[in-house]
Each structure stands twice: as C-alpha cells, then as structure tokens.
Amino acid sequence: LSAAFTFLFAGCNPSTQPSDIVNSYDLSLSYDKNSHTLSGGMRFYFVNECEEEISFLLFNLHANAYREGASYPAVAKEYSSSAYPNGKSYGNISITSVKTDDSALNYEICGEDENLLKVHLSAPLEQGNNVTVEIMYSVKLANVRHRLGYTNRSVNLGNFYPILCYMENNAFCEYPYYNLGDPFVSECANYNVTLICPESYHVAHSGSKISEQKNQDGTTTYKFKADTVRDFALALSENYKVLSGTADNTTINYYYFADSKAESTLELICRALITYNELFGNYPYTDYCVAETDFCYGGMEYPQLVFISSGLVREQYVSTVLHETAHQWWYGIVGNNQISSAWMDEGLSEYSVMLFYKKNPDYGDFDTKLK
C-alpha cells in the first residue's frame, strides 16, 4: 500500500491548490418524470495543460450506450433479465447545440459506437490558455435497473452528461462502453449543479447540497457543489426515507426504501468511514450519501455517493456498502484507470473490506470472511 499512499496526496483532495485542478462543469438540469427525460445545459471551463496546442475537445457520451442498436450496449447479456424486468427499453443523449462566447461551434458525434462528442474549437488552444464551451443536450432514460435509467420507484442518474475524455501523452483516450466492469476514467474537476425536479422526489447526490427551494409549479430547485471530484451523479425517488449521522467530520445521509435495519446500516456506514479514515487518511469531503436503488449489480461508486442494489440479502448488502465506501479512496481520492487497471481499485477496495472486518470483529469473523 505504500505506493498508494504516495499517490493519495496527489489525487482528488479539496485541499489541493486551485491551480492544480483547473477544469469545471456547471450543469443545469431539469427532470420530467412523465417523459423520463433529463434536459441539460453545461458550461465547461477547460485549461490546456498539454505541451502542445489542441484544436478540439473530446467528450464521452456514456448515455448513448443505452440506445437501440448500440454495438457496445450498457447491459451485458447475462444481466439482461435482471436489468430489464419489464422488457427491453432504450435511451440516448441528444446534443442540440454547442457554442462558446455566443458563437456556434462545429461538432460531431463519433467514436466506435456514437459514444464521443468532438467539439471543434474556433481557434487552436495553446498551452496554458483556456476556453469555456456551452453544450445543450437532452437525455432520454431507458426503463432499466442500471447506472442510468428509471424504474417505478427510482431514477438513477449516473454517467449522464458529456464528460471530458481522459488525456494521456497529450492526447484524448477513446474507450467504448464496456459492459463488464466500470468503463470510466476521468480527471478531477469542480462541479456546480442545479437540478429542477418534482417536489415529491428525495435526491441523493454527489457533492454538498447548497440550497433547496420549492417552486410554485410543484417543482423543487436544488443546488449542489462538488470540488475536486472525478464525476457527479444523482439518485431520485419518491419513496426514499432518509437517516443522517456523522463520521468524524463528514455528514452521512442514508437513503433507503424499506430497510428493516436502517439504523444498523447507518451505523455501519459511519463505522466504515471512520475505519477507513484511520487506515488510509481522512476522507476529504464534508458529505457522503449512500442510496439504496433499483440496480442489477451489487453497487456502484461515484464521488460522495454510492448506489446499493435493493435486491441484495443482508450479508451482501453489508459487504457491498463496505466495498463501495472503500471506493471513495480507491478510484475516488486515489485515481486509476478503471478500464485498463480495474484490478487496482477493485482489488484495493476488497482488501479494504477485509481490513474493516479485522478491525471490527463484531461485524464478522475475519478468518471466515477471508475464506
């Protein structure tokens, strides 16, 4: 773990100097529960830190993996029946405009599977210079128990917006949406997010909630802020109950449907965060949300937010909470390429779970868990 600790302080940490984390996303979102559509606008601020000028920006369009006819569909065949209990359903992302400084920019949908948005800049961007690009888009959600989709009681908004492709050796990396494992890799950035949704929804979120304003039309406007994180996600439900607690300097919010042991789950989340703080260094964020949701896998990690499947039995639920919480360090704070080096964050997260059991024997015998 010594190498990992070395990288810990060079990863996503809000105490990092602002000049080290330069890109930012301002997202304005509106969710229509009748059409299951998320309308969005994004202002993306980018500084060229490459050693040479660049003439375009490249963004991942992960939402297009849910469209009909996708060559790299989001859901693997072996999970299809679990993900689509009501039959196949499709979604996609549509780009409606791209501009900068009120001037339209040329763009194209490209990649192996219409999974990339290429934005051509009006002039080459030299090293150290910056540009702000505005992208308007609309996401149609599929009826699917997955990272991005809706069911009769939850709306999962993971990997929904255009996100800048990871850069390596002064070039953008292009990856399709592999449906086994986590097909994502991104640098840290700052996020300011505004969401308008029906007031009946409770919203689990990345970042911190800055404000909540009820509107006369029956909607609520939420504002969130997340600094130096690798992504931003949300989970919405009209059925959520919420329990809150604290772990060291972090506020914990647990969103659940019908967990008969909800108080124990909240205590588990707090204990996990405290244990990992002691083992790996303090969690650098003030808020952490755990959201039970309809999901065909065990769980999914996002910065300051994790999804936990509603279909797990208790023992699986506990181990998944521990595993996904460990991902806050391994992938979140300590970054790695989750596509080419999945063994790293997954291996360290599972190892962290074993360390938790060793330090907290009241949650299970370490030797038994190790077997």
Question: At which residue positions do the language-model features occur?
Answer:
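N-terminal, polar/Ser/Thr-rich
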Residues: 3-7, 11-39
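Beta-strand-rich interaction surfaces with strong enrichment in secreted/lumenal proteins
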Residues: 27-29, 106, 120-125, 179-183, ...
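Extended, low-hydrophobicity, Ser/Thr/Pro/Gly-biased non-transmembrane segments
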Residues: 43, 82-91, 96, 133-235
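Asparagine-centered strand-capping/turn motif at beta-strand->loop junctions
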Residues: 46-50
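Solvent-exposed beta-hairpin/edge-strand motifs
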Residues: 56-103
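Short strand-edge motifs at loop-to-beta-strand transitions and within beta-strands
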Residues: 115-119, 131, 220
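Hydrophobic helix-coil surface modules that form long, contiguous segments used
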Residues: 182-322, 351
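Zinc-dependent metallopeptidase catalytic helix centered on the HExxH motif
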Residues: 306-368
